[in-house]
Structure formats: structure tokens, C-alpha cells
Regions:
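Non-catalytic, surface-exposed connector residues within folded enzymatic/regulatory domains
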Residues: 1, 15, 41-44
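A detector for short, charged/polar N-terminal pre-domain segments
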Residues: 1-2, 66
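Compositionally biased, low-complexity segments enriched in small residues
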Residues: 2, 7-8, 30-33, 55
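Short basic helix-loop element that most often maps to the first helix and adjoining turn
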Residues: 5-24, 49
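Short, charged recognition helix plus adjacent turn
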Residues: 9-10, 34, 60-68
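DNA major-groove recognition helix of helix-turn-helix/homeodomain DNA-binding modules
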Residues: 26, 45-60
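Recognition helix of helix-turn-helix/homeodomain-like DNA-binding domains
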Residues: 26-42
Length: 68
């Protein structure tokens, strides 16, 4: 599963809208959409904020890349 799909899946699992997540990590909702759709990738500080807000492990996001 791609990183963007994992972000979307976890966000919806937590019942968060893109706007709510964006407000929590201080980015725009369109940025969240871009991350989820693989259009762009978050900067390191934003990635850390996403990991904390979504309560996920960084290894979960990158496990497909680490095992290949």
C-alpha cells in the first residue's frame, strides 16, 4: 500500500476530515489531499506531525519500501 493510501486509511479510521487533520498539523487541507494522492510528499517536520496526529509508527508508512 502506498504511503498516501496509508495516510488516508488511518485518517478515515480515526474519523478525521482532511480539514481537521490539516488544522492539527498546521498545513492546508489541499496539502493533505496532495499527500494522500501522491502528488507531493510532506517535509520531514510535517511528516513527524502526521505520524503524531495519526498515532502511527513511521515503520508502518515505509514498511513496503523497507522490505523490497
Amino acid at each position: 500500500m502506498e504511503i498516501g493510501n496509508k495516510l488516508r486509511s488511518r485518517r478515515t479510521e480515526l474519523g478525521l476530515s482532511r480539514i481537521e487533520l490539516a488544522e492539527q498539523i498546521h498545513v492546508t487541507a489541499s496539502s493533505i489531499s496532495n499527500y494522500e494522492n501522491g502528488i507531493s510528499y510532506p517535509k520531514p517536520d510535517t511528516l513527524i506531525a502526521l505520524i503524531l496526529a495519526l498515532k502511527i509508527d513511521a515503520n508502518y508508512l515505509y514498511q513496503d519500501y523497507l522490505t523490497n
